[in-house]
């Protein structure tokens, strides 16, 4: 399994739009990506901030996610709400 934990910070007055886009992405992932085992969106307790936890069975599943039509369109949509690039906090690989 491959897990990524990332922090996204919204522009001023864009948090609600960012959160709505994040929920759209999570729904699209759940509906279309059998290689995804977890796509959690967490409010971080910091202003305008969400933390994403994404878990995939392997690199092939991650590539499918990155190249999916829904991620291309929704990725642009959420990108317009962000104050900067997403910050990757951790990349984890299960050893068992």
Label for each model-derived stretch:
Residues 14-37, 73:
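Short amphipathic alpha-helical segments
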Residues 40-48, 75-96:
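Glycine-rich beta-strand-turn "strand-cap" elements at beta-sheet edges
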